[in-house]
């Protein structure tokens, strides 16, 4: 009887210790700028992501213009810092850079997000604006992967986007069922489009523009926070882009103010920034860490 009681007591002690460790790990993750978050039921990733579309279109971006492999080097540095979400688009022409940066890394250690351009004019050549199931093989080859975590309809700018682009819904849903993608969503560049996306049942995740300085975003802070809140209430992943206004918030004070504000905004999962130097990554992560500490008080 004593031996049984000892075993039971010891087992209870181990369970309590395990629970304490788990709580400590969760608390540490909650305060880490690169802690893991659940973007969708299928995708767990870092709360900070690396964007590759600064001043991008027709498969050119600042990552191309920098040259000399600087973008690849920056992404490798970001990965080493714990950033594991990498955001791309067909119209950015950055698939190959991300594939090069992540070569040799375990596939389950990072998240790939890309976008399909559907609007007439700009973006990519007209003949290449195809349904997702006709693009997936090229995307997989360019990214050197067997699956893509998240594919989005890119740059929604009008409230009629459902009627215009629902031809992409079924192909993407089939790709998800086949395991070639894990989730599908939209990238919103107009508030009217975002308001619809926040409620639409097809949308697993949405990109929303938000910063404290109202740069490169549609509407004010409160209007966009309300959209993010609606999206979260409807079970959607929320990715905040333009946190630094695509470089237009160009003072240390402004960047810190906006980063902390977005970090403390509760209705989001991931924040993405188009980092162009290692010191930009360091500064952003420091500001996110400060925002998390302030929120935890």
Which role does the model predict for each range below?
Residues 2-110, 261:
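N-terminal binding-site loop/beta-alpha segment at the start of enzyme catalytic domains
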Residues 4, 33, 156-297:
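Beta/alpha (TIM)-barrel catalytic core signal, keyed to glycine-rich beta->alpha loops juxtaposed to Asp/Glu
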Residues 40-42, 99-107, 140-144, 198-201, ...:
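Acidic (Asp/Glu)-rich catalytic clusters
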Residues 49, 85-87, 149-152, 185, ...:
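Conserved beta-strand positions in the central sheet of alpha/beta enzyme cores
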Residues 50, 86, 112, 148, ...:
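Conserved, mostly hydrophobic/aromatic
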Residues 54-68, 119-130, 250-251:
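Active-site mouth loops of central-metabolism enzymes
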Residues 63-77, 128-142, 189-196, 254-259:
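Short, acidic/polar
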Residues 143-159:
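Active-site groove signature of glycoside hydrolases
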